[in-house]
Amino acid sequence: MVKSRPLPSIFEFNKLLSAIAKMKKFDLVISLGEKMQRLGISHNLYTYNILINCFCRRSQISLALALLGKMMKLGYEPSIVTLSSLLNGYCHGKRISDAVALVDQMVEMGYRPDTITFTTLIHGLFLHNKASEAVALVDRMVQRGCQPNLVTYGVVVNGLCKRGDIDLAFNLLNKMEAAKIEADVVIFNTIIDSLCKYRHVDDALNLFKEMETKGIRPNVVTYSSLISCLCSYGRWSDASQLLSDMIEKKINPNLVTFNALIDAFVKEGKFVEAEKLHDDMIKRSIDPDIFTYNSLINGFCMHDRLDKAKQMFEFMVSKDCFPDLDTYNTLIKGFCKSKRVEDGTELFREMSHRGLVGDTVTYTTLIQGLFHDGDCDNAQKVFKQMVSDGVPPDIMTYSILLDGLCNNGKLEKALEVFDYMQKSEIKLDIYIYTTMIEGMCKAGKVDDGWDLFCSLSLKGVKPNVVTYNTMISGLCSKRLLQEAYALLKKMKEDGPLPDSGTYNTLIRAHLRDGDKAASAELIREMRSCRFVGDASTIGLVANMLHDGRLDKSFLDMLS
């Protein structure tokens, strides 16, 4: 254009700038505007409006204001379009007070703010969490003779629903009806979706029926919101009925609709229904996405159908839907829980080959699986790899590591890790301390366990019932029954209250020590607390009864 002779008119340049601005290439518009000036092509009001709008869209308000000043010096008066662009810039640029002031200035300057102006300001007020001012502005619009339109009400309904002010959104529907403005499917969808998010499923269904009564045709968004909500409540038949209903009305379900149903069905173990939906998706040429496959794989893993989960994993890869970290984490967890740790390890290696780096969950899951499998050496190797790969262990990782080391007779190694944790900035919780106390007691180092237990109050950590039971069990293993009983007394006085495990541990210890009277007293106390003998206690009493060391009254007391 700039090489044409004669030069095209400013109107032609403005058409070009406007078209580029609509494509949201604001930097290019600004650059072209500067080039026009260098070539001596003067801007007119329309050009300035386009450029000011572009600066505002780029959140460069100061440059927009500078251009406004230049334009006014050249004798151009800003139009309602100019000021609306600035208003939009203020609203999106965290300058809401300037936006409100600008509207007041517009009135003082003799401009009459229109529906677009007010709607822009209302949207800005909601963006800045000023809902009451936004709602009040709707009434002010009417007072100033500017009737809110469907877009205005849509903005207000959306803002209220995002805040959870659903009652106010309903009031607005009534206002619209009084003003003879018919709410459209978008407004109904907004309220229905909000009702679903805040778990008012029956209200959402009632509103759905109301919109149909008013002749407003629901769309795929309406159905998807309701189906997803019904699924989260386990109302499968209602969700399936809605799916049938939308298909009957020639409203094609989309990926969101199918994903909601599939995710819900697999979590409930309804795999036949989930797989039928998956097949139906493919028949309708809707490509399942990573969420679809992850839902199916997660459901299969949750219900211990690992071979089916692996099949689905291989199928998704064959369809060029590549597994993500969630996919691998789900499968690794499933295999480790089912004691198929080798399969989990193989997937872990495959991840690396695909260029995926495991996260804290990946490593922690695999470490736990290896420890449960008795593979202490490889569990430690994976932990070392985790640290060398720069993946930060969390408190759960350390808890699993310490527990695994202690349970596999590696107390010294556990103590090294524990010592490192104490010296670092890791905030240790009661579960970590309980694990170490148990590890010490199991290794016969009850005195060390006792010292650590006694230090908890100095560390500002309150022992829970498991901590007490662990320490009582350790003391009982060394036949330190008086000390164990003293802990029971402390629990009753200071909390936490003893549970079934506390009493059963002490009862067995006194029985093994031959103190029938103390055992009988503990049984009576336990029963008064509505606890009963566990399998280990009943088994011990039965054996002692068989050997003639106890009479039947003990068994009767426990039953």
Curated annotation (Swiss-Prot):
- Sorted UniProt keywords: Repeat
Highest taxon of the source? Eukaryota
Note the Pfam families from the entry: PPR, PPR_1, PPR_2
* UniProt-listed InterPro entries: Pentatricopeptide_rpt, TPR-like_helical_dom_sf
Q: Where are the PPR repeats?
A: 9-43, 44-78, 79-113, 114-148, 149-183, 184-218, 219-253, 254-288, 289-323, 324-358, 359-393, 394-428, 429-463, 464-498, 499-533
Listed as disulfide-bonded, the cysteine pairs are none
Q: Which family does it belong to?
A: Belongs to the PPR family. P subfamily.
Q: What PANTHER family would the database entry show?
A: PENTATRICOPEPTIDE REPEAT-CONTAINING PROTEIN 3, MITOCHONDRIAL
This protein's name: Pentatricopeptide repeat-containing protein At1g63330
- The organism of origin for this protein: Arabidopsis thaliana
